[in-house]
């Protein structure tokens, strides 16, 4: 496999990370940062949250919902997938409180859960648009 055919994440895994020439623990910095390191439970919860985002289908749903509130039928049509596929992905996003819904008569409309989610989505999208 040529280097050019590797994805960005694969090529990063093959690069050697720079390390200190001589290991030296800076105790004062360690003492300052140690209380701020999240607990294993918090890290697990955050990993599950990011795992919900680590799927192209769910990110495509979020990109549509970042534009406007939509029902499952409209999301399925926009993404050219089945309603059951959209429902399945929305269930995962809801489990992490990334999307919410409201019922109007027989219709159910989905939107991003709040400004935190909208800001997270926009910040990542903006970050990916930046050039190095």
Swiss-Prot record:
Keyword annotations of the record: DNA-binding, Metal-binding, Repressor, Transcription, Transcription regulation, Zinc
Domain HTH arsR-type: 38-132
InterPro entries registered for this protein in UniProt: ArsR-like_HTH, ArsR_HTH, HTH_ArsR_DNA-bd_dom, Metal_resp_trans_reg, WH-like_DNA-bd_sf, WH_DNA-bd_sf
DNA-binding region: 72-91
SMART domains, sorted: HTH_ARSR (SM00418)
Residues annotated as transmembrane: none
GO MF, one annotated term: metal ion binding
Residues holding Zn(2+): 20, 26, 71, 73, 114, 116, 127, 130
Task of the protein: Transcriptional repressor of the expression of the ziaA gene. Controls zinc homeostasis by triggering ZiaA-mediated efflux of excess zinc into the periplasm.
Oligomeric form and interacting partners: Homodimer.
Name of the featured protein: Transcriptional repressor SmtB homolog
UniProt source species: Synechocystis sp. (strain ATCC 27184 / PCC 6803 / Kazusa)
């Amino acid at each position: 496999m040529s280097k050019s055919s590797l994805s960005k994440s694969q090529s990063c895994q093959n690069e050697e990370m720079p390390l200190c020439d001589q290991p030296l623990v800076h105790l004062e910095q360690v003492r300052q940062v140690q209380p701020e390191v999240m607990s294993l439970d918090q890290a697990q919860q955050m990993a599950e949250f990011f795992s919900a985002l680590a799927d192209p289908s769910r990110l495509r749903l979020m990109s549509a919902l970042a534009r406007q509130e939509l029902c499952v039928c409209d999301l399925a049509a926009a993404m050219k997938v089945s309603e059951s596929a959209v429902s399945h992905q929305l269930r995962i996003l809801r489990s992490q409180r990334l999307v919410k819904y409201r019922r109007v008569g027989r219709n159910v409309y989905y939107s991003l859960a709040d400004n935190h989610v909208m800001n997270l989505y926009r910040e990542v999208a903006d970050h990916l648009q930046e050039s190095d």
